[in-house]
Amino acid sequence: MRQFILSLLACLCLTAYSQTASQADLLVEEAQKLESKQDYPTAITKLKQADELYVKTGKTQSAERATCLHILGRCYLNRERPEGLTYTQMAANMRKTILGETNIKYISSLNNTGLYYLTVAKDYPKAAVIHGKTWELCSRIQPRPEQAFMFHINLARCYIALGEMDKASAIVEEEIAISKKMYGEKSLSVARQLQQIGSLYYLSGRKDVGVTYYEQAFNIFPDDSKEYEQLLDWISSIYVELNNQPKVLEYMKLAEAHNKKELEKPCDEPVCLTERAQYFASIGDNDKARAHFLEA
């Protein structure tokens, strides 16, 4: 009877242990959803609760806890908070021990460590060293991981920050060539990457370089897409800032042609009517603007 009671108690303990671990996993899942909505404070709270449960259940050195710490560090980094480095490094060390150096999860944590020095600490030389190591490890993995583009471009970001534009340009052109070969020269995947690279240069103060990548992306996106309209606006504005009159005129004509085509489409939804009212107001046609506002 005593043996039976001890066995029952052991089973109950194991069940409670399992439930606690499962609760931690659920908290991490909830936190990821919150992170996707950019609700970082609530996500951080849930991740810290999950971390406490992992430690409580003996999962101090586990893949699950490493994932929790990785996401926790990322949430702090998205808020540009220094705590992000501590959690990211803990995740990286844990993943390196459990999974090995050439595991993509370890490399992702190493990448985030580099991002801390690049975007928060602004220690560009150190960021370049870490992102160089990230890329070196990533390049060993075959077949090429889907994260490879991002890891390599992050190294280019370091070179741009350091003013080493030739090195950055070499990486960018290499990645574009790879993407064109993988997805096709006129694929939307390539267009999105070109747009991303354009933003990278633009935000780094190199508008003259960024706009050339925006133009390449613009020439791929369909003219009825939101990206096309967005890039048309961005490119026009940049050439105005750069005082490049021939390009300003070129994109003004493209904008006029695009607007004319859009006006030929049916429009009876409030959002569409409001947008058209704003357009007519911008060109000084107040009668049509008023009519569309009233109809909306």
Task: Give the residues covered by each predicted segment.
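Bacterial Sec-dependent N-terminal signal peptides
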Residues: 1-23
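Short coil/turn linkers that connect adjacent helices within long alpha-helical scaffolds
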Residues: 56-60, 97-101, 140-143, 181-185, ...
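Conserved alpha-helical positions within TPR/SEL1-like repeat arrays
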Residues: 25-36, 63-78, 88, 104-119, ...
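N-terminal leader/linker segments that initiate helical-solenoid repeat arrays
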Residues: 16-48, 52, 56, 60-70
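Eukaryotic tandem repeat interaction scaffolds
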Residues: 199-202, 218-296
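TPR-repeat structural position
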Residues: 40, 81-82, 124, 165, ...
